[in-house]
């Protein structure tokens, strides 16, 4: 194929959109944009305006109401009706988007709109709906990394998207052969929220031409914005649904409204089933002939996480009470078309209040059941069916039941629900980057290979549980976890779950960890949780304790660590606190290893959980559900979910993946072999050496194209190193891979120096560079043990009496600072150097190093503020006020900033504003840790 420029790609797209039904208009600046919006507003509201178009004053009043809002607020205004007072004091309501009759909106397309705010910018392709720029398309020529278009959008959004451009709902980026879409937001745009579009069979639609044909037809695009974008009230963000979610909702709605049949949706764990099922419920609840939509979840899933998720999509959606009489009242309340409740509560309501629910013997009702593979629904289904005679049932599951893994009564998911309406399998989700693949290790803990994981029953003359829980084996497994945990979790950047076969096993492992933990320099934070039975079987006197006593000890340990006050009388609160802890950490601390039997292995989502240790038998849906706790997408430093099996579950893993990915080829789901990654590394290393034979030669590169080649080559190498480190056989030596750790650190330092240089140049001046939009993937480079806290710990250990030892400590810190990859530490690098060179030598043994460093930073910060204010001729106290506000809110107060800058010429004002914003952000990061 001949070379195609960005201009040619843009022109081709404009022609295609015109053929699809968009009116091609010429809009070159903000004034023309406003004039076009006003014209269409008058046309669409001609009846209401009664022949009197909006006057200048009226239009200005409208702009005052809709301009200057956040992206989130703009999205709400877009979907609402806005009252406008006319000059004659009458009032009319204006709408900006027809969210029900999608094709009745007016569709236009323009290109090369120029705007000038902080910097001048020219946008590629802008799609206008009813005159508002709702979709922005940014293009790169073929061969350019699509991430550069993403970074350009981020830059434009920060510097240029103001006025009506705050109404952009969605961005589309493409290099002609790869195309993605993502929602606009006030918060940081994340690469993980860039989605591919696909067809109903989950085949990607990559090329820009095919994408436009499928996704950007006028009615389809308006439908996508109106129906399949969600305003998340809790997080105040816009969410775009993924293609498989859209197709599943449409298939379910069609089945519910055009037939009387049931059905189920099979979407893999971690693919966003909650949003899909809730959106389907919401749309069905708006159908006139459906009297009630009842969303059913299992009681154990209606925890704080589920409530939080549901209420994001519609405030107050979750019925939190377990009072069945209230559920009956809600069922009879015609103003509540949608109810979210538990399976157990619904069963009780039917059993005790059948006469009060008489109307539902004839009224059409739709039940939507989350995690419908569970046996509880099969048991309850018969009871509900007897009462709700005109009901349809739709299930959502990530792991359906087939003949191989049927429920206890032998039924499959298809037996209960009928046909599968849509599938999105684990292989699809991994391919699209919506979940991660798995790296699975099998650790042999027996010399006697005859005892296999499938021997989970009592075999004649052999008590297998006794063997599994032998003191020697339990300690062996515990030591293996302790010795490898930092490697698996990237120096405890991530959390883990350890699942074991029984409560007895959990207690034994907890006590072993507790004993061995005392010998560690940096003890692991261990927690345990299980449900005890009030009247417990003592297993013929073998166990000399009640499990509640042991749980009380675990909770007491937890209370001491996290300053809480739980007990076995408040296990629900303990559960919720652990749930929050494993997701986000508590008070700058978090659980490293959570030991469970079955809890947290289904329905629990945590992006910062990356490792599962397994010492129990798992198969089919239980295995996939447990493994899937680790594979939520987070950032570049988490390339896969790590599974460490202490039983031979190889066959069970292969069988489960075969069933739930519908393929015998598991290579797309499991990590490749060490040898394959090693070969890939060797190739990448050779490529890097061809560009820059030694690290110091990076300093000699003058050409930006060559510098870009270095960045891309080292970035690839770093990604492969990240994967190699997951393997036990990996050694960072010249003998093993041809490169040692020191050489890698030297290349990394040069890479980070280029990153700092580009970041600094971008902040200081509007310099166009091919490096501006390159994706450095800095998170992948970080070594989370070498950070500010790490350095402060070394500082505290300096022997202030022994000058020779002091010099050795100082030299150690200097070496670490030279190779610092933590962003905050790099900012503090010069400060710490000055402190150890000029302050530490003058201290004596009675001085508090922590306090001395705080005092030193305070003096330096004061000097920086005084110097910057003096250089810019601005008020120092006002600058500090802005900085304090920023430290609290993360936003530079525009009112204070405007007041401080004063009446400078426009160009100088922009320059001053940019300089102050950069100074405040950098000093906050520099002195705020």
UniProtKB/Swiss-Prot annotation:
One of the GO BP terms on file: DNA restriction-modification system
Gene3D superfamilies for this protein: 1.20.58.2040, 3.90.1570.50, P-loop containing nucleotide triphosphate hydrolases (3.40.50.300)
UniProt protein name: Type I restriction enzyme SauCOLORF180P endonuclease subunit
Gene transcribed to yield this protein: hsdR
Family statement drawn from the similarity comment of this UniProt entry: Belongs to the HsdR family.
One Pfam family this sequence matches: EcoR124_C
PROSITE patterns per record: HELICASE_ATP_BIND_1
EC number: 3.1.21.3
SUPFAM superfamilies, per the entry: P-loop containing nucleoside triphosphate hydrolases (SSF52540)
PANTHER family attached to this UniProt entry: TYPE I RESTRICTION ENZYME ENDONUCLEASE SUBUNIT, TYPE I SITE-SPECIFIC DEOXYRIBONUCLEASE PROTEIN SUBUNIT M AND R
Binding site for ATP: 268-274
Cited function: The restriction (R) subunit of a type I restriction enzyme that recognizes an undetermined sequence and cleaves a random distance away. Subunit R is required for both nuclease and ATPase activities, but not for modification. After locating a non-methylated recognition site, the enzyme complex serves as a molecular motor that translocates DNA in an ATP-dependent manner until a collision occurs that triggers cleavage.
Catalytic activity: Endonucleolytic cleavage of DNA to give random double-stranded fragments with terminal 5'-phosphates, ATP is simultaneously hydrolyzed
Other known facts: Type I restriction and modification enzymes are complex, multifunctional systems which require ATP, S-adenosyl methionine and magnesium as cofactors and, in addition to their endonucleolytic and methylase activities, are potent DNA-dependent ATPases.
Keywords of this entry: ATP-binding, DNA-binding, Endonuclease, Hydrolase, Nuclease, Nucleotide-binding, Restriction system
Helicase ATP-binding domain: residues covered: 254-418
Subunit structure, as described in the record: The type I restriction/modification system is composed of three polypeptides R, M and S.
MF annotations from Gene Ontology: ATP binding; DNA binding; type I site-specific deoxyribonuclease activity
């Amino acid at each position: 194929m001949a070379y195609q420029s960005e201009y040619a790609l843009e022109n081709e797209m404009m022609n295609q959109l015109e053929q699809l039904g968009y009116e091609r208009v010429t809009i070159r600046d903000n004034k023309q944009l406003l004039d076009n919006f006003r014209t269409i507003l008058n046309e669409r509201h001609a009846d209401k305006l009664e022949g009197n178009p909006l006057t200048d004053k009226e239009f200005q009043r409208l702009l005052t109401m809709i301009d200057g809002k956040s992206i989130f607020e703009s999205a709400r205004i877009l979907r609402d009706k806005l009252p406008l007072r006319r000059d004659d004091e009458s009032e009319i309501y204006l709408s900006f988007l027809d969210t029900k009759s999608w094709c009745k909106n007016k569709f236009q397309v323009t290109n090369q709109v120029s705007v000038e705010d902080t910097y001048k910018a020219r946008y590629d392709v802008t799609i206008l709906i009813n005159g508002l720029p709702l979709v922005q398309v940014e293009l790169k020529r073929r061969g350019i990394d699509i991430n550069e278009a993403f970074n350009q959008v981020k830059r434009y959004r920060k510097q240029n998207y103001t006025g009506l451009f705050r109404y952009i709902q969605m961005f589309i980026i493409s290099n002609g052969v790869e195309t993605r879409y993502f929602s606009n937001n006030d918060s940081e745009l994340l690469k993980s929220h860039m989605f591919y579009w696909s067809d109903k069979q989950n085949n990607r639609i990559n090329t820009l031409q095919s994408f436009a044909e499928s996704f950007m037809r006028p009615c389809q695009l308006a439908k996508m914005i109106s129906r399949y974008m969600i305003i998340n009230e809790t997080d105040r963000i816009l969410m775009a649904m993924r293609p498989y979610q859209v197709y599943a909702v449409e298939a379910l709605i069609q089945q519910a409204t055009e037939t009387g049949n049931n059905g189920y949706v099979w979407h893999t764990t971690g693919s966003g089933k909650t949003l899909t099922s809730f959106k389907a419920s919401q749309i069905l609840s708006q159908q006139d002939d459906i009297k009630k939509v009842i969303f059913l979840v299992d009681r154990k899933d209606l925890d704080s996480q589920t409530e939080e998720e549901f209420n994001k999509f519609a405030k107050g959606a979750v019925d939190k009470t377990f009072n069945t009489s209230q559920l009956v009242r809600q069922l009879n309340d015609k103003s509540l078309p949608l109810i979210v409740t538990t399976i157990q509560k619904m069963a009780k309501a039917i059993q005790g209040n059948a006469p009060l629910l008489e109307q539902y013997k004839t009224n059409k009702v739709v039940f939507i059941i989350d995690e419908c593979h569970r046996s509880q629904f099969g048991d309850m289904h018969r009871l509900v069916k007897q009462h709700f005679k005109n009901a349809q049932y739709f299930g959502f599951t990530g792991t359906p039941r087939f003949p191989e893994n049927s429920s206890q009564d032998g039924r499959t998911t298809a037996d209960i629900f009928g046909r599968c309406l849509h599938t999105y399998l684990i292989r699809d989700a991994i391919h699209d980057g919506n979940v991660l693949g798995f790296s699975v290790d099998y650790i042999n803990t027996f010399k006697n290979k005859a005892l296999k994981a499938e021997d989970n029953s009592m075999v004649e003359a052999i008590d297998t549980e006794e063997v599994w829980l032998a003191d020697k084996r339990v300690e062996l497994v515990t030591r293996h976890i302790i010795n490898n945990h930092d490697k698996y979790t990237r120096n405890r950047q991530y959390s883990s779950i350890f699942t074991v076969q029984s409560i007895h096993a959990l207690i034994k492992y907890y006590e072993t960890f507790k004993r061995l933990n005392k010998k560690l320099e940096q003890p692991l934070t261990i927690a345990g949780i299980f449900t005890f039975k009030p009247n417990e079987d003592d297993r013929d006197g073998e166990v000399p304790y009640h499990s509640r006593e042991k749980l009380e000890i675990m909770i007491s340990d937890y209370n001491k660590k996290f300053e809480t006050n739980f007990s076995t009388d408040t296990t629900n609160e303990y559960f919720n606190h652990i749930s929050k802890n494993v997701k986000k950490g508590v008070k700058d601390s978090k659980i490293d290893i959570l030991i469970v039997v079955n809890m947290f292995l289904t329905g629990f989502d945590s992006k910062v959980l990356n490792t599962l240790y397994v010492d129990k038998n798992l198969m089919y849906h239980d295995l996939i559900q447990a493994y899937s706790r680790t594979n939520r997408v987070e950032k570049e430093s988490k390339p896969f979910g790590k599974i460490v099996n202490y039983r031979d579950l190889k066959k069970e893993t292969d069988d489960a993946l075969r069933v739930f990915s519908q393929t015998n080829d598991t290579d797309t789901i499991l990590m490749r072999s060490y040898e394959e990654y090693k070969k890939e590394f060797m190739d990448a290393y050779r490529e890097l050496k061809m560009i820059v034979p030694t690290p110091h030669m990076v300093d000699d590169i003058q050409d930006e194209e060559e510098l870009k080649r270095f960045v891309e080559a080292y970035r690839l190498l770093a990604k492969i190193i990240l994967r190699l480190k997951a393997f036990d056989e990996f050694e960072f030596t010249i003998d093993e891979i041809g490169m040692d750790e020191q050489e890698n650190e030297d290349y990394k330092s040069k890479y980070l120096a280029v990153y700092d240089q580009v970041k600094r140049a971008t902040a200081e001046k509007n310099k166009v560079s091919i490096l501006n939009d390159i994706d450095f993937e800095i998170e992948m480079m970080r070594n989370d043990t070498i950070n500010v806290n790490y350095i402060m710990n070394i500082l505290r250990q300096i022997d202030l009496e022994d000058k020779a030892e002091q010099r050795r400590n100082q030299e150690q810190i200097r070496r670490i600072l030279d190779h610092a990859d933590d962003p905050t530490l790099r900012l503090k690098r010069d400060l710490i150097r000055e402190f150890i060179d000029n302050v530490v030598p003058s201290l004596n043994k009675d001085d508090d190093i922590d306090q001395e460093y705080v005092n030193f930073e305070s003096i330096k910060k004061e000097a920086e503020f005084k110097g910057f204010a003096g250089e810019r001729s601005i008020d120092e106290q006002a600058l500090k006020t802005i900085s304090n506000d920023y430290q609290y809110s993360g936003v530079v107060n525009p009112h204070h900033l405007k007041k401080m800058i004063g009446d400078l010429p426009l160009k100088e004002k922009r320059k001053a504003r940019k300089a102050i914003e950069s100074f405040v952000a950098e000093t906050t990061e520099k002195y705020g840790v």
